[in-house]
């Protein structure tokens, strides 16, 4: 065989031999939903939200809002489990929320009397008493941070100059 024939045979055999090997799957890069990307905040890395948790109705969304609340208001519908942040243009950003057992009892209006970034958290005495398996180790409090159940922000609701003990806060549960 000539040199050219050998090179041509080798060139034609390489793809055939490659087909005999194991197939290597290309891993798809996970899709990140805009607005839910990884964020670095005060030195804490908050991972991107897995798209499987962002099912319909679970993503923040700008929606028409005509209930008449003042721009800047935060309106919580505890039964629909939605929070609305009212804008000036007749819209609101709607968020899916969780509502604690006690949260259902909040009625009327309040105002944000305090805001905290990376708030500390202490379970109530009742939480420690009724569920020591979950809360006893945190009875002395848990400093703000990536493992704190309040998440990165908390709004403390007041009424008549007093803390109502109701909070609007983030979570470390990304489900």
Predicted regions and their residues:
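N-terminal pre-domains immediately preceding structured catalytic cores
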Residues: 2-3, 7-8, 13, 20-175
